[in-house]
């Protein structure tokens, strides 16, 4: 019985279409808890901030480099996680990530210098966070289609519940056993990533019929078309002057067309070529870097990262600097996390509605998030910080749970390139992940005012809004250029047309001065 259960969890799922459920619900639960033990811990790390400053006698900017290096490694190694996932499978990579995360956090609890934490949490755990998070969110997107936005949004609330629960719990635990043993406990707790990673069964989408049946059906359809084509074309040729002959083989699925000029006739040779899907897919597709819409979206992620992590790191020190006790300051972080839950779920429901331009909803949320970051600089007491925390938490939730799944939308790259796009996108975010927290810490060290840390966050988010606003125009501009280029090629006789979709090929059959001879040749 146990062996059957293990076999059930290990074999791949094969579907004829995107299931929008099935084992995907187990994957969604796994993603929830992976979020708990990855981003949930990263965002809760602010509770150790003052303890580390006192123990190592270091400045804000020096301590902030711990999370900065961690986020940098997390995002910088995203292409590596993509390659390993495509090569060895998502399950093994996530389980390896869980081991690395736990090892780094446990080693950090024995650190005697802040540089030791740079290696333990920054590099080792950072690499583990990437191996754990990215493959999980990628495979979750493959299990869901219509429900992708809402499922991802709800599952991503794991980090919010983690911050809500861990922030006060770790504060209480530190008072009893100290920050080192508390960090050790967190590291052992993160071993659960290995368990939930084991639930990530791979998914394969194939056609509803076997290849043999499809070939037979194609041959029957081709034969039927051949029998009826003579009658139809003989009638059409009276008006259009088109003469059509076809070979008795199955109709090709992918065509190359070549126009050869004649005295009063153009001959269109249609040759079959292998399906694109039969070619071996690259482990990492860098062709997405040629799409201007993706470049703009990646720049959006780059600048937005400046405002993602610093607020959660500095909200507790900011509250303490304003005379708020530690317990109430920790409650600010918990409140921010709960507001983020509602933001993620709300965004999921809104983006799940059809039809809707999801990129525009995201843009509105980014603008409001920029406003919330500026609002922190004007707060002077507990309830002002509470209001800002709720507003910020809700708005960051609308973006945090949707900015990666939004890559699967046609406005950006589409679901076919989702895996490679996610790896490159998070890789580009690494620059801001490295610079964000130290930049905020530098502003604090120079001014001795914690609210100044939010200026860099707000400035980065404002630039992110500008880049996001350019995504849709860039996509439309590319499409228009693509159409005009194809029209020019078709209009010139004697030119070679390669890899042109049939939908874009228009022939003027009304002209009698040209006769078109169509010949279909077998492979």
Swiss-Prot record:
<feature type="transmembrane region" description="Helical">
    <location>
        <begin position="424"/>
        <end position="444"/>
    </location>
</feature>
<feature type="transmembrane region" description="Helical">
    <location>
        <begin position="92"/>
        <end position="112"/>
    </location>
</feature>
<feature type="modified residue" description="Phosphoserine">
    <location>
        <position position="247"/>
    </location>
</feature>
<feature type="topological domain" description="Cytoplasmic">
    <location>
        <begin position="352"/>
        <end position="358"/>
    </location>
</feature>
<dbReference type="GO" id="GO:0016020">
    <property type="term" value="C:membrane"/>
</dbReference>
<feature type="transmembrane region" description="Helical">
    <location>
        <begin position="22"/>
        <end position="42"/>
    </location>
</feature>
<feature type="transmembrane region" description="Helical">
    <location>
        <begin position="331"/>
        <end position="351"/>
    </location>
</feature>
<feature type="topological domain" description="Extracellular">
    <location>
        <begin position="380"/>
        <end position="381"/>
    </location>
</feature>
<comment type="function">
    <text>Monocarboxylate transporter selective for taurine. May associate with BSG/CD147 or EMB/GP70 ancillary proteins to mediate facilitative efflux or influx of taurine across the plasma membrane. The transport is pH- and sodium-independent. Rather low-affinity, is likely effective for taurine transport in tissues where taurine is present at high concentrations.</text>
</comment>
<feature type="transmembrane region" description="Helical">
    <location>
        <begin position="359"/>
        <end position="379"/>
    </location>
</feature>
<dbReference type="GO" id="GO:0008028">
    <property type="term" value="F:monocarboxylic acid transmembrane transporter activity"/>
</dbReference>
<feature type="topological domain" description="Cytoplasmic">
    <location>
        <begin position="403"/>
        <end position="423"/>
    </location>
</feature>
<feature type="transmembrane region" description="Helical">
    <location>
        <begin position="185"/>
        <end position="205"/>
    </location>
</feature>
<feature type="transmembrane region" description="Helical">
    <location>
        <begin position="63"/>
        <end position="83"/>
    </location>
</feature>
<comment type="similarity">
    <text>Belongs to the major facilitator superfamily. Monocarboxylate porter (TC 2.A.1.13) family.</text>
</comment>
<protein>
    <recommendedName>
        <fullName>Monocarboxylate transporter 7</fullName>
    </recommendedName>
</protein>
<keyword id="KW-0472">Membrane</keyword>
<comment type="subunit">
    <text>Forms functional complexes with BSG/CD147 or EMB/GP70 ancillary proteins.</text>
</comment>
<dbReference type="InterPro" id="IPR036259">
    <property type="entry name" value="MFS_trans_sf"/>
</dbReference>
<feature type="topological domain" description="Extracellular">
    <location>
        <begin position="43"/>
        <end position="62"/>
    </location>
</feature>
<feature type="topological domain" description="Extracellular">
    <location>
        <begin position="321"/>
        <end position="330"/>
    </location>
</feature>
<dbReference type="Pfam" id="PF07690">
    <property type="entry name" value="MFS_1"/>
</dbReference>
<keyword id="KW-0812">Transmembrane</keyword>
<dbReference type="GO" id="GO:0015718">
    <property type="term" value="P:monocarboxylic acid transport"/>
</dbReference>
<feature type="transmembrane region" description="Helical">
    <location>
        <begin position="119"/>
        <end position="139"/>
    </location>
</feature>
<keyword id="KW-0597">Phosphoprotein</keyword>
<feature type="topological domain" description="Cytoplasmic">
    <location>
        <begin position="206"/>
        <end position="299"/>
    </location>
</feature>
<dbReference type="GO" id="GO:0005368">
    <property type="term" value="F:taurine transmembrane transporter activity"/>
</dbReference>
<feature type="transmembrane region" description="Helical">
    <location>
        <begin position="300"/>
        <end position="320"/>
    </location>
</feature>
<dbReference type="GO" id="GO:0016323">
    <property type="term" value="C:basolateral plasma membrane"/>
</dbReference>
<feature type="topological domain" description="Cytoplasmic">
    <location>
        <begin position="474"/>
        <end position="523"/>
    </location>
</feature>
<keyword id="KW-0813">Transport</keyword>
<keyword id="KW-1003">Cell membrane</keyword>
<dbReference type="InterPro" id="IPR030766">
    <property type="entry name" value="MCT7"/>
</dbReference>
<feature type="modified residue" description="Phosphoserine">
    <location>
        <position position="234"/>
    </location>
</feature>
<keyword id="KW-1133">Transmembrane helix</keyword>
<feature type="topological domain" description="Extracellular">
    <location>
        <begin position="113"/>
        <end position="118"/>
    </location>
</feature>
<dbReference type="InterPro" id="IPR050327">
    <property type="entry name" value="Proton-linked_MCT"/>
</dbReference>
<feature type="topological domain" description="Extracellular">
    <location>
        <begin position="445"/>
        <end position="452"/>
    </location>
</feature>
<feature type="modified residue" description="Phosphoserine">
    <location>
        <position position="237"/>
    </location>
</feature>
<feature type="transmembrane region" description="Helical">
    <location>
        <begin position="382"/>
        <end position="402"/>
    </location>
</feature>
<feature type="transmembrane region" description="Helical">
    <location>
        <begin position="453"/>
        <end position="473"/>
    </location>
</feature>
């Amino acid at each position: 019985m146990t062996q059957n259960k293990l076999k059930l969890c290990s074999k791949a799922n094969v579907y004829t279409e995107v299931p929008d459920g099935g084992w995907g619900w187990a994957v969604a639960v796994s993603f929830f808890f992976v979020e708990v033990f990855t981003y949930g811990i990263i965002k809760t790390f602010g509770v150790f901030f003052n303890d580390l400053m006192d123990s190592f006698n270091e400045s804000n900017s020096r301590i902030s480099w711990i999370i900065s290096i961690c986020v940098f490694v997390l995002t910088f190694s995203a292409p590596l996680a993509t390659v390993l996932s495509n090569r060895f499978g998502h399950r093994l990579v996530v389980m390896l990530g869980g081991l690395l995360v736990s090892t780094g956090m446990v080693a950090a609890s024995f650190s005697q210098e802040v540089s030791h934490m740079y290696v333990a949490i920054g590099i080792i755990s950072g690499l583990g966070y990437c191996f754990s998070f990215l493959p999980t969110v990628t495979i979750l997107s493959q299990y869901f289609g219509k429900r992708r936005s809402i499922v991802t949004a709800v599952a991503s609330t794991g980090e919010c519940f983690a911050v809500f629960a861990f922030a006060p719990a770790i504060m209480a635990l530190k008072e009893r056993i100290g920050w080192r043993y508390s960090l050790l406990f967190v590291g052992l707790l993160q071993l659960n990533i290995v368990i939930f990673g084991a639930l990530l069964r791979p998914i394969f989408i194939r056609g509803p019929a076997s290849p043999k049946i499809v070939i037979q059906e194609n041959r029957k359809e081709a034969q039927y078309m051949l029998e009826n084509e003579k009658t139809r074309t003989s009638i059409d040729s009276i008006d259009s002057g088109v003469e059509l002959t076809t070979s008795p083989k199955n109709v090709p699925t992918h065509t190359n067309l070549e126009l050869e000029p004649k005295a009063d006739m153009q001959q269109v040779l249609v040759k079959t070529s292998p399906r694109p899907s039969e070619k071996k897919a690259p482990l990492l597709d860098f062709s997405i870097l040629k799409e201007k819409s993706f470049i703009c979206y990646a720049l959006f992620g780059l600048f937005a990262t400046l405002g993602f992590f610093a607020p959660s790191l500095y909200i507790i020190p900011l509250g303490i600097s304003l005379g708020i006790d530690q317990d109430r300051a920790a409650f600010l972080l918990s409140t921010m996390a709960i507001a983020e839950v509602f933001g993620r779920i709300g965004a999921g429901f809104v983006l799940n509605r059809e039809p809707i331009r999801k990129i525009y909803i995201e843009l509105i949320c980014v603008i409001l998030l920029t406003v919330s970051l500026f609002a922190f600089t004007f707060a002077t007491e507990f309830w002002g910080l509470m209001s800002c925390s709720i507003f910020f938490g809700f708005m960051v939730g609308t973006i945090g749970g949707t900015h990666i799944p939004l890559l699967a939308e046609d406005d950006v790259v589409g679901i076919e390139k989702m895996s490679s796009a996610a790896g490159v996108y998070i890789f580009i975010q690494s620059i801001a992940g490295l610079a964000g927290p130290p930049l905020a810490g530098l502003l604090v060290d120079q001014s001795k005012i914690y609210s100044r840390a939010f200026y860099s966050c707000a400035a980065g988010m404002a630039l992110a809004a500008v880049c996001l606003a350019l995504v849709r125009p860039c996509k439309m501009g590319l499409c228009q250029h693509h159409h005009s280029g194809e029209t020019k090629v078709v209009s010139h006789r004697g030119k070679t047309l390669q890899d042109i979709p049939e939908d874009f090929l228009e022939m003027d059959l009304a002209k009698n001065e040209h006769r078109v001879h169509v010949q279909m040749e077998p492979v």
